[in-house]
Amino acid sequence: MKMADAKQKRNEQLKRWIGSETDLEPPVVKRQKTKVKFDDGAVFLAACSSGDTDEVLKLLHRGADINYANVDGLTALHQACIDDNVDMVKFLVENGANINQPDNEGWIPLHAAASCGYLDIAEFLIGQGAHVGAVNSEGDTPLDIAEEEAMEELLQNEVNRQGVDIEAARKEEERIMLRDARQWLNSGHISDVRHAKSGGTALHVAAAKGYTEVLKLLIQAGYDVNIKDYDGWTPLHAAAHWGKEEACRILVDNLCDMETVNKVGQTAFDVADEDILGYLEELQKKQNLLHSEKRDKKSPLIESTANMENNQPQKTFKNKETLIIEPEKNASRIESLEQEKADEEEEGKKDESSCSSEEDEEDDSESEAETDKTKPMASVTNAHTASTQAAPAAVTTPTLSSNQGTPTSPVKKFPTSTTKISPKEEERKDESPASWRLGLRKTGSYGALAEITASKEAQKEKDTAGVIRSASSPRLSSSLDNKEKEKDNKGTRLAYVAPTIPRRLGSTSDIEEKENRESSNLRTSSSYTRRKWEDDLKKNSSINEGSTYHRSCSFGRRQDDLISCSVPSTTSTPTVTSAAGLQKSFLSSTSTTAKTPPGSSPAGTQSSTSNRLWAEDSTEKEKDSAPTAATILVAPTVVSAAASSTTALTTTTAGTLSSTSEVRERRRSYLTPVRDEESESQRKARSRQARQSRRSTQGVTLTDLQEAEKTIGRSRSTRTREQENEEKDKEEKEKQDKEKQEEKKESEVSREDEYKQKYSRTYDETYARYRPVSTSSSSTPSSSSLSTLGSSLYASSQLNRPNSLVGITSAYSRGLTKDNEREGEKKEEEKEGEDKSQPKSIRERRRPREKRRSTGVSFWTQDSDENEQERQSDTEDGSSKRDTQTDSVSRYDSSSTSSSDRYDSLLGRSASYSYLEERKPYGSRLEKDDSTDFKKLYEQILAENEKLKAQLHDTNMELTDLKLQLEKATQRQERFADRSLLEMEKRERRALERRISEMEEELKMLPDLKADNQRLKDENGALIRVISKLSK
């Protein structure tokens, strides 16, 4: 039964399993591919830092915020100023970047340029309206942090020119906070707005900056002395952290809770500056006395005030009055208890007053900057989050403008909205001192709260804050902020508070630390700089200013601030995935933000970037292709058939520009027509010989042209002499010679036209070299050949190859020598008979190849001195050849153009040369007989000279090469020697180290050996004693 039950249960389990969720799960867990997406702003900042203006433009067109700030509050303009990228600075300013945008520590781009010493950027920024009186969270203007004299001079001149009051700018924050605190006190209602990110209040700012007057007024107005920010810091935490003794005393006198802990579990003692720890302990003792006295008196009013909240309108006044009285009594008791401490305090106050006069001035402007910044933050975040809560008409939109422009009547510098601003807005300003801790940066946690919640709180407070305060009473919160900031500034030096990151990073000496802590180190989010706000109002930059906060002088910023400071851009970036639309895809794709549809943007990015790169490469290739094409044109390999040569050329350079193919097509037209009587086998043999004797990359140089012309002259003179001797020997054939001459003269008339084509044919012989040129069967029209020849010559002359004309000259000389050969051949043919003349002429024409000169490796030999001189002349320089050339030309009454004009006059020269060469043997051979010997001697001497010069040049070149090689060899040897020495030293050191280790091992063995020796000695002594005993 039990077995049956078990089986039944098992079957039921199996049935339940089938179709269950677990059964339906796939056996292999599918892992989703992680896709990395970057925020639009991060992509924009990266593009700006890389200097890619095209990419930046595309991002801007796609809706990127040009004033986007990273977690440190740094915008692209800040980064460009730090990187000394003048072009990007100009580009960003031209595209609407806020030139006075502060970062988390109140540094505007001008601060960055001044601290780095970039004069050109500073001049440009000033010219574009940068505020030279801008004060950062430490109370420093660009002039204060300028590194170089030239920069200081520039900024000082600009300050003088604009009439900026630096001291007033520094005190602006405290003055505004005082005004608002008085206004709250008079109105009986505190309408402070917490800072959007830190949750700081005006009381925090006043305590941290040491604005004692503001602090007193705020407490009188009914501020809760134990109010906490988002990180749980009370005003006492701030005052203790920044070392503000007076602020601590005021808070303790007003019975703040000294044991309150923040969210990290730290009391004010834990985060306090080391310098005031003792003072805080004394204050705690006094407060305990006060508490005991009050417990004795059982004063309910004081107890109620201790827990009083900000928004109690009626009770606040009653309790406030008693509060004012009680603290004074308590203060008198405390002072009576410690007169010594009072004296010290007074001295400290004097010191602080001297310092804090400056510090307060700095902090005023800083806290103003904080209020202004934080208020815009709230309003901006409201705008960004599209919160449609209906605030009072005076409160809703004016928050930005009023926050920026509330300087009221006392502020004469900023004539914008003064007393007209609604009290709610002004109070909000003062409340924005909540930003007090933007600069304080205690723990990274304070930046965690979203700006949206802060903005909602701000709006709620705006809606609830209905009390209108008179413009005459300045805000309390501003003065509070100043004092709080002083306290916070001092706290920077606290090194032992582990979880808190000291706000001030660069304290040097104690005095500096005190001053800086009191005024400068507090990085307030410039919620109180109304002056800044008005300037920024004018530049429509309130949003960005609201989002940024100040930092210490260094540009290194903390990341917890970074997280909270940047205003998130809510624009979703549409991505284009198709690679076709290059610009659009570029605009959309490069920055794949978290808001883009997943998967689409990466593809768009790749395609767009690849398109752009492809376009750039193609343009570069187009630039380079023209010379490439020309180069290929000059010396293609010699192909046997005309058609195959053109096709091969076009196919090999298919990737280059179409112009190259066009030129190749043109070249097809200059190829010498194949004669009918020449068989295919003969043509192949000729092309094969041409390929053997010529390098595929060989060109034609000017030197070769000149050599060819001299060679023509020499070969012509030798041939004329031989022909004259033959005529003398064969007088019986003079009639036939005359007939032949007459035929030649008749053909000369037609040749005058054909010689214009002659050069083009000789040029093309560089590609089909050994194919004999039939002047009569040339079918190419002279005009077309001339035009194509001109273009081809131009293309070849553009080449960079030094020997680009070798083929032309050799072919040129070969063409002229062929004419002379033909004349001699025809005379010989006349001897043998006219019936055999045609085939014999072909053979004869083919045989005198040994007299022709190839441009490549010459493979024929002859014993005559003339041909040897011709071979020597291949290496001669161009200068003396020019002389011989002009001589030989002028001898034939042709226009003697210098060889330097060869490129211009080459076409005409070729025709005149060949024509004169043709006529010379027939017309004036006998007349020139006497002069040819002298010419030959002269040419021989010139050839020798040129040969010697060439040899000298070659030897000089070899000498320089050898010297270079020698130097390289010596350097190599030295390096090798050094290396060998080093290696030898290393080997020796290793050997010594081994030796030392061996010796150490031996030393370790030495005690053992000594012990063994001692033992053996003892044994020997014992044995000796035993033996002596036995011997007895």
Curated annotation (Swiss-Prot):
Places the protein is found: Cytoplasm; Cytoplasm, Cytoskeleton, Stress fiber
UniProt keyword list: ANK repeat, Cytoplasm, Cytoskeleton, Hydroxylation, Phosphoprotein, Repeat
Gene Ontology molecular function, alphabetical: 14-3-3 protein binding; enzyme inhibitor activity; myosin phosphatase regulator activity; phosphatase regulator activity; phosphoprotein phosphatase activity; protein kinase binding
Comp. bias regions, Basic and acidic residues: 291-300, 318-340, 422-432, 481-491, 614-625, 674-683, 719-768, 816-842, 869-885, 916-928
Residue list for modification Phosphoserine: 299, 422, 432, 445, 472-473, 477, 507, 509, 601, 618, 693, 696, 804, 854, 864, 873, 905, 910, 912, 997
UniProt cross-references to Gene3D superfamilies, sorted A to Z: 6.10.140.390, 6.10.250.1820, Ankyrin repeat-containing domain (1.25.40.20)
ANK repeat positions: 39-68, 72-101, 105-134, 138-164, 198-227, 231-260
Modified residues (Phosphotyrosine): 446
Tissues with expression: Smooth muscle. Detected in aorta, portal vein, stomach, intestine, bladder and lung.
Compositional bias (Polar residues): 302-316, 400-421, 540-551, 602-612, 798-812
Domain of life: Eukaryota
Biased composition annotated in UniProt, kind: Basic residues: 684-694, 843-854
Any one annotated GO CC term: A band
Compositionally biased spans, kind Low complexity: 383-399, 469-480, 633-661, 774-797, 886-900
InterPro entries noted in UniProt: Ankyrin_rpt, Ankyrin_rpt-contain_sf, MYPT1/MYPT2/Mbs85, PP1_Regulatory_Subunit, PRKG1_interact
PTM annotation (Phosphothreonine): residues: 443, 697
GO biological process, one term: cellular response to xenobiotic stimulus
Motif range (KVKF motif): 35-38
Protein purpose: Key regulator of protein phosphatase 1C (PPP1C). Mediates binding to myosin. As part of the PPP1C complex, involved in dephosphorylation of PLK1. Capable of inhibiting HIF1AN-dependent suppression of HIF1A activity.
Protein name as annotated: Protein phosphatase 1 regulatory subunit 12A
